[in-house]
Structures are given as C-alpha cells and as structure tokens.
C-alpha cells in the first residue's frame, strides 16, 4: 500500500525550520530532556454547539444497559439454607460510602512545639496557658525600619545604594524644605489676626497703580495706532496722486505722438481745384472736423501758434477776407495761452508743468482749426499754386518738422 505523504501547511513548515536551526531532528521530543511532544499541536475548528470535553461518539461507545445489569446483579444476594434458596436484595445504605465524623482532637490545631534537628523545643509552658489565651488573636508585630534593615542584612529596594550611590543630599534638601514650610506655617498662624489689617492698605495702593499703568498703556497703544493710520492714509493719498499724474502724462504723450504722425502723414501736396463750389468745400470741412473729433488727431503748433504741417501757398479768390487777419488772430491766441501759463507757473511742479505745456499745444491747435474753418466758411477758398513750387517747398518743410520734433524731445527730457 502506498502511503500518501502528509501535506504540511505554511505555518508547520516555518515551525520545523525554526526547530531545525536549534538542533532539533525529526522524532525527538521537545524540552531539555527531549521527553516532550513529538507531534505538533493541530488547531481544529469547532463547528458545533457542544461544550468542552463532550464526546460525540459516547452514545455509540457507552453501554449503559450492561452497567445497569451488573449493578442490579451485585445488589442481589443468594442465600442457601435449610428452607432452600433465598434471594435477598441489599439495602441502598450498604452501597453508600460511610463518612465518619472527625474527632474533636483535630478540629482545631494548636501548635505546641517546633522540630529543630530532630529535637522538640516547646514554645511556652503548656501549664500556664489557658483557653482564653488560645482563643484571643495575637496582634501582628510591626517591625521598624532598623529592624527590617537588620533582617534584610542591609539590602534595600534602592539597588543603587548597594554600590554606594545614595540620596543623602536629596533627602537633606527635602528635610530642609519641610522645616522651612513648617516654620512659615507657624509664623502665619501667629500673625493671623494682625496680618489682614496691615496688608489691606498696600493691596489697595497696588490696585490703583495697576489701574493707572493699564490706562497709560491703553492710551499709548491708541496713540500709536492713530499715528500709524494717519501715516498710512497720507502715504496712500500721495501714491494715488502720483499714479494719476503718471497715467495722465502717459495718455497725453501717446496723443501727441499720434498727432505728430498724423501731421507728418497729412503734410503731402494737396491740390485744390478752383472750379469747386462753396457747398462741396463746406462738406469737406465738416468731414475733416468730425474726423478730428473722433480720432483726436490735431495739427502740431509751434511756439507762436502757427501750423507746422506743410500747407501750399494759396491766394484768396474772394476779396472779402484777408489772410493776414487770420495770422493776427493766431498770434493773439498764442499770447493768451502764454499769459495763462505764466500766471500758474509759480505753484506748479515739474510733472504739472509738462501737462500744462501739452494742454497749451492742444489749445493752440484748436484755435488754429477754428480760425481756418471760420475764414473758409465766409466764402474765401484757397487755391494752390503751381505744382513745381509746391514740390520745391515740400522737402524743406519736412526737414523743419524733423528739427522741431528733436527740439521738443530735448525740452521734455530737460524738464
């Protein structure tokens, strides 16, 4: 018959490996004398509701009927006499075990002697003892520290003291603290009545001083907070003003740059026909005015208030208006602007002066445009001269414009 090998679990294999490391071999028992178990304990799962020690096969192995028959047969006694055979049944009392009463001698054990090396040594004289002494419990004997130290031969629970490390300094310090505390308690009891009367006045003074200090601290903190808030608001106001000035200067600078570019682009030769009527010229003026208002594109003016953009020489076909009159008006407009600027120069900063200059240029340009529109609306039309003269003047005017631009840039940098 082939024996199937026992399949070992993972835990069993691990346990065998650990035992083999320590010199155990298969078949040996556990323990120093190797008389322990040789088979490992196997864990079984309990899947029933029976108690511990219950044998589920007892109903098959327990022959209760044979035991009962044997008991009844043992209780029957067969007597053979003159009268014949008689069967007598034993009483139940004979089957029970008898429990005799214990003797009074051993009910209460009294120690009378101690055995010492085979000899008896009586503890006390039995003749002098009485029943009262025997029944009274003796009080336990309380040993003092010295007696305990002597009985333990100098050994204590403090193991470090055996090698000379004691706590004498600490114990002395604790004792001194206790004595100081006791002395303080005695002094406080002696001065118990007089102390409250004397301490009441200093305590009130201390309270007043404490309140004054708290009030002063609160005042100083409020003052410091107010100063900080004022400084912060002043700083924020200054920063906002500077920011606004910077933004305004940037906007005006971009507007002037766009105006100069537009003026340079529009400075080309313009030919005006003499055959145009008054109505189309007015329409063109209106369109130009609308374009200037929408785009913010204005012509660049010089210091005297004159237009820098290249304009062809023209003659007035209608003799009602004189071109000199318009130039005079431009001059007066520029002078008014100069006087306004000089009046406000004293109380202005550098940034505000720049802004004023740019505003002045814009006002000059607006004045010139209004004058041009009014002179043309009265019936006079500008007629261009021959193309050759215009072409000769164009490069010169262009060079003048560039020069003026450079001069303005240098003025702005210096200011």
From Swiss-Prot:
The keyword Cell membrane does not apply. The modification Phosphothreonine is found at residues 4, 116. Residues 11-57 form the G-patch domain. The modification N-acetylmethionine is found at residue 1. InterPro entries: G_patch_dom, PINX1. Residues 116-141, 191-415 are annotated as: Disordered. GO terms for cellular component: nucleolus; nucleoplasm. One of its GO terms (biological process) is hematopoietic progenitor cell differentiation. There is a cross-link at residue 46 (Glycyl lysine isopeptide (Lys-Gly) (interchain with G-Cter in SUMO2)). Residues 335-345 have a biased composition (Acidic residues). The modification Phosphoserine is found at residues 130, 258. Keywords: Acetylation, Isopeptide bond, Phosphoprotein, Ubl conjugation. GO terms for molecular function: nucleic acid binding. Residues 191-201 have a biased composition (Polar residues). Residues 353-364, 398-407 have a biased composition (Basic residues). Residues 118-141, 224-239, 387-397 have a biased composition (Basic and acidic residues). PANTHER family: G PATCH DOMAIN CONTAINING PROTEIN (PTHR23149), G PATCH DOMAIN-CONTAINING PROTEIN 4 (PTHR23149:SF9). This is G patch domain-containing protein 4. It comes from Mus musculus (Mouse).
């Amino acid at each position: 018959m082939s024996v199937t090998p026992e399949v070992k679990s993972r835990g069993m294999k691990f346990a065998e490996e650990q035992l083999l490391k320590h010199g155990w071999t298969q078949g040996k028992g556990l323990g120093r004398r190797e008389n322990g178990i040789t088979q490992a304990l196997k864990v079984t799962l309990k899947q029933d509701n029976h108690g511990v020690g219950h044998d589920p096969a007892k109903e098959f192995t327990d022959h209760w009927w044979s035991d009962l028959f044997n008991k009844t047969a043992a209780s029957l006694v067969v007597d053979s006499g003159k009268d014949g055979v008689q069967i007598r049944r034993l009483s139940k009392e004979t089957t029970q075990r008898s429990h005799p009463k214990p003797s009074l001698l051993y009910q209460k054990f009294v120690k009378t002697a101690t055995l010492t090396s085979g000899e008896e040594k009586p503890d006390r004289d039995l003749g002098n003892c009485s029943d009262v002494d025997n029944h009274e419990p003796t009080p336990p004997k309380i040993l003092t520290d010295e007696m305990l130290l002597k009985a333990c031969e100098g050994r204590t629970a403090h193991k470090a003291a055996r090698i000379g490390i004691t706590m004498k300094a600490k114990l002395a310090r604790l004792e001194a603290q206790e004595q100081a505390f006791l002395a303080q308690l005695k002094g406080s009891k002696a001065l118990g009545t007089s102390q409250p009367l004397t301490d009441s006045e200093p305590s009130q003074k201390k309270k007043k001083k404490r309140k004054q200090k708290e009030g002063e601290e609160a005042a100083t903190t409020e003052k410091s907070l107010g100063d900080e808030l004022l400084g912060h608001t002043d700083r924020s106001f200054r920063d906002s003003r500077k920011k606004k000035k910077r933004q305004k200067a940037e906007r005006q600078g971009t507007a002037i740059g766009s105006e100069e570019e537009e003026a340079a682009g529009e400075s080309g030769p313009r030919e005006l026909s003499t055959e145009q009527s008054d109505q189309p010229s007015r329409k063109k003026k209106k369109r130009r005015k609308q374009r200037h208002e929408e785009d913010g594109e204005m012509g660049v003016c010089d210091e005297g208030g004159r237009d820098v953009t290249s304009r062809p020489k023209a003659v007035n076909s209608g003799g009602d208006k004189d071109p000199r009159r318009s130039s005079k008006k431009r001059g007066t407009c520029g002078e008014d602007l100069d006087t306004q600027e000089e009046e406000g120069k004293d109380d202005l900063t550098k940034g505000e002066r720049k802004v004023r200059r740019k505003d002045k240029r814009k006002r000059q340009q607006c004045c010139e445009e209004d004058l041009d529109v009014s002179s043309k609306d009265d019936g006079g039309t500008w007629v261009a001269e021959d193309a050759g003269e215009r072409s000769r003047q164009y490069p010169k005017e262009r060079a003048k414009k560039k020069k003026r631009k450079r001069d303005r840039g240098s003025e702005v940098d210096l200011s």
